[in-house]
Amino acid sequence: ARNLDPWLMTSKGVLKSFVSNSDADISVTEGVMGYFDGFSGNSNFSSTYHVANITRSPVLLVLDASKTARSIAATALGFVKFHKNSRIVGLILNKLGSKKHEDMCRAALAPLKIPILGCIPKNPDLSLESRHLGLIPAVEQDDLKQKITKIAKTLVPYLDIEKIISIAHKTGPISSTIKISKEKAKTTIAVALDKSFNFYYYDNFDSLRRNGAKIEFFSP
């Protein structure tokens, strides 16, 4: 996993990171905050929408359907119409209370003709622990892989996986040139890496290595 941050990396850096780490059938980019939330209240800069534009990615908008039914259509329409090209190609409804609740949301959304690619019921097991600064780091969760596997298996029946894959395959090719140094490592850089020091942008390490550095990790 990598961080795509236009604020620190610039659009060019985001594209380079995305392309160089996309050696897979499908690349999934998870947004943070609200879809259009970025640098300021009157700019999309550094928002998830901004990143989607840089990478030319189709967007699946996940909506919290708890405590709403017909109003969810107004929310979805607002996101889609906020910009001429919102890049939103489908919806996933989350935290549904019942089949009746799902049917009400579907009925409200039907006139918008936005594909609904998933309807996920409320389930406390479909969450990862968090605290005031965000999710608990992976290094502090010994059973994280097992949790993710369990969540994935639970979600499969509620998602239109084939349609999601089809949307991903319709995206056009993108490319970015990355210069790789052929010189041997000239400098060794020590980096603290353990349970206390673990939040890094790994593209920084890649950049250092491309420019002749050898990274040595240690625990203080």
PLM regions: where:
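Short, structured coil segments at secondary-structure junctions
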Residues: 55, 112-113, 211
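Internal gly/pro-rich beta-alpha loop/helix module
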Residues: 69-181
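Short, aromatic/basic amphipathic alpha-helical patches
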Residues: 1, 103-110, 204-208
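Structural motif
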Residues: 28-30, 60-62, 64-65, 92, 94-97, 190, 192-195
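Phosphate-binding active sites in nucleotide-utilizing proteins
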Residues: 185-220
